[in-house]
Amino acid sequence: MSNVRVSNGSPSLERMDARQAEHPKPSACRNLFGPVNHEELTRDLEKHCRDMEEASQRKWNFDFQNHNPLEGRYQWQEVDKGSLPEFYYRPPRPPKGACKVPAQESQDVSGSRQAVPSIGSQAYSEDRHLVEQMPDPTDSPAGLAEQCPGMRKRPAADDSSSQNKRANRTEENVSDGSLNAGSVEQTPKKPGLRRHQT
């Protein structure tokens, strides 16, 4: 390293170290519009939410906070749940991470079949006025995670069936006389291309 030359145009290492210590480089995350006034931001957000709520009340003549109809151009009336289309009261789909256990039957290792209740058959709904039964605590997404920590899309295969893919055999391997009792697959070959010499 003693043979390394430092050009006059570049600062020496000692000067660079001193400069970094004196004036630390400002962070890349900069506030372009000045410091944030959190009180003003909160007031603006609350005002915006109130304005949106009032606009919705005027548009639909319904008090969404108190769940009461208001006087206006719409006539709100209570209807029976049975007269509504099913998608209005159908329980929501379980979350993507929830276990999907078939409701009919499952088969254990010995081959005997058992009836298994379907997990997630009850509703996961926060709209309690639409759902008559409250979900079981074990049916919650947290309970499902405990019951099915690592559900796989496919069950793990036995060691004997792990090699169920057939080998891709070529013509040379077939002519060796090492044929299996099963069928032989051959890879199709492209027709030979003429090479032009230049």
Curated annotation (Swiss-Prot):
Keywords: Cell cycle, Cytoplasm, Endosome, Nucleus, Phosphoprotein, Protein kinase inhibitor, Ubl conjugation. One of its GO terms (cellular component) is nucleus. Residues 1-34, 85-198 are annotated as: Disordered. The modification Phosphothreonine is found at T170, T187, T198. It comes from the Eukaryota. Residues 14-25 have a biased composition (Basic and acidic residues). It is found in: Nucleus; Cytoplasm; Endosome. The modification Phosphoserine is found at S10. InterPro entries: CDI_dom, CDI_dom_sf. Residues 1-11, 104-124, 175-186 have a biased composition (Polar residues). GO terms for molecular function: cyclin-dependent protein serine/threonine kinase inhibitor activity; protein-folding chaperone binding. A peptide sequence containing only AA 28-79 retains substantial Kip1 cyclin A/CDK2 inhibitory activity. Belongs to the CDI family. Important regulator of cell cycle progression. Inhibits the kinase activity of CDK2 bound to cyclin A, but has little inhibitory activity on CDK2 bound to SPDYA. Involved in G1 arrest. Potent inhibitor of cyclin E- and cyclin A-CDK2 complexes. Forms a complex with cyclin type D-CDK4 complexes and is involved in the assembly, stability, and modulation of CCND1-CDK4 complex activation. Acts either as an inhibitor or an activator of cyclin type D-CDK4 complexes depending on its phosphorylation state and/or stoichometry. Forms a ternary complex composed of CCNE1, CDK2 and CDKN1B. Interacts directly with CCNE1; the interaction is inhibited by CDK2-dependent phosphorylation on Thr-187. Interacts with COPS5, subunit of the COP9 signalosome complex; the interaction leads to CDKN1B degradation. Interacts with NUP50; the interaction leads to nuclear import and degradation of phosphorylated CDKN1B. Interacts with CCND1 and SNX6. This is Cyclin-dependent kinase inhibitor 1B. It comes from Cricetulus griseus (Chinese hamster). The gene is CDKN1B.
